[in-house]
Curated annotation (Swiss-Prot):
Glycans are attached at residues 83, 240. Residues 1-28 form the signal peptide. Residues 33-172 form the WIF domain. Residues 173-205, 208-237, 237-269, 270-301, 302-333 form the EGF-like domain. The lineage of its organism: Eukaryota, Metazoa, Chordata, Craniata, Vertebrata. This is Wnt inhibitory factor 1. It comes from the Eukaryota. One of its GO terms (cellular component) is cell surface. One of its GO terms (molecular function) is signaling receptor binding.
Length: 374
């Protein structure tokens, strides 16, 4: 027998006791559990199926658990998990529940693990159950642990269960990971660093930031980015410009501005219009102005009057006309004095021909000449 087989052979006795009789009179005949030949080779050095439960009954073995437990060795360092195979044949339904998977020495080994739900139905297809013994690798030592599981039939009767107060043992040793484990990671017994949440890498040296660090930022701890010069923000997504962007420009890179239409230059300080836009207008393209309300023209130099001042006036400000001589009104559409003469003329003579006297003509010509602005 190999050296591994010499130390591993008694291990079968440990797991032959994981399930013991709960009801000696039970005659269920379609539940099976065994250790397959491949796993047996690892344990005892030769390939042979090891039957644990057959036809709902335990394989012939001692039932004096206390005496047997005294002879149980600790699981060796080189065995990290054990595989069992089970199957429910026929039409019968069986249910299982892991009541406890607990390490009693958590500084040496974490809680045992299984590769299946803790509560479920025994499958009708041969299925492997793997029980793992996760040594932490922090120190040399032997960890005590318990595995408590029951199997019930469809009527809810417990037919198999772990003996009460069953304690098992696993030998662990301090692991060595070349380069060490950082950021709270620990070296397991497979000499691999196991990293805490938020870190990854062979030595747990890399932090995980979500969202990721942008613009060359470095994630130094979960959720914290160190930003390169010129950037800031939770994930370095914001730009810190040393120079201010003018005329509505936007900084997108340290010292670089995205200029709005009509401006150029490092700080968007230069207008693309050769002559500046007037009256509040903005340069919107090469030599093209976008005028503010009330103005028009290439340079926004022409005021707008609505409606227009007509043929007898000039628009000098938005909606403000300057009338020619002899014209008045807001839009210069009224001739000066016409309303006054009609008002003074007698009613009966408005339709008669009338020749003004020389004196009235002189008085009329004596009216002051003025350029009205309305």
């Amino acid at each position: 027998m190999s050296l591994t087989g010499y130390f591993a052979a008694p291990l079968c006795s440990i797991f032959l006791f994981i399930l013991a009789h709960a009801d000696a009179g039970q005659q269920e005949d379609s539940l099976y559990m065994w250790i397959d030949a491949h796993q047996a080779r690892v344990l005892i050095g030769f390939e042979e199926d090891i039957l644990i439960v057959a036809e709902g009954k335990m394989a012939p073995f001692t039932h004096d658990f206390r005496k047997a437990q005294q002879r149980m060795p600790a699981i060796p360092v080189n065995i990290h998990a054990m595989n069992f195979t089970w199957q429910a044949t026929g039409q019968a339904e069986y249910f299982y529940e892991f009541l406890s998977l607990r390490s009693l020495d958590k500084g040496i080994m974490a809680d045992p693990t299984v590769n299946m739900p803790l509560l479920g139905t025994v499958p009708h297809k041969a299925t492997v159950i793997q029980v793992g013994f996760p040594c932490l690798g922090n120190q040399d030592g032997v960890a005590a642990f318990e595995v408590n599981v029951i199997v019930m039939n469809s009527e809810g009767n417990v037919i198999l269960q772990t003996p009460q107060n069953a304690i098992f043992f696993k030998t662990c040793q301090q692991a060595k990971c070349t380069g060490g484990c950082r950021n709270g990671g620990f070296c397991n017994d497979r000499h691999v660093c196991e990293c805490p949440d938020g870190f990854y890498g062979p030595h747990c040296e890399k932090a995980l930031c979500m969202p990721r660090c942008m613009n060359g930022g470095l994630c130094v701890t979960p959720g914290l980015c160190i930003c390169p010069p010129g950037y800031y923000g939770i994930n370095c997504d914001k730009v810190n410009c040393t120079t201010h962007c003018l005329n509505g420009g936007t900084c997108f890179y340290p010292g670089k501005c995205i200029c709005p239409s009509g401006y150029e230059g490092e700080q968007c300080e230069t207008s693309k219009c050769q002559q500046p836009c007037r009256n509040g207008g903005k340069c919107s393209g090469k030599n093209k102005c976008k005028c503010s309300k009330g103005y028009q023209g290439d340079l926004c130099s022409k005021p707008v009057c609505e409606p227009s001042c007509g043929a007898h006036g000039t628009c000098i400000e938005p909606n403000k006309c300057q009338c020619k001589e002899g014209w008045n009104g807001r839009y210069c559409n009224k001739k000066y004095g016409s309303n006054l003469m009609n008002a003074l003329r007698p009613t009966g003579s408005r339709n008669r021909q009338h020749t003004p006297s020389p004196k009235r003509t002189e008085d009329r010509q004596a009216l002051p000449e003025s350029n009205y602005i309305w």
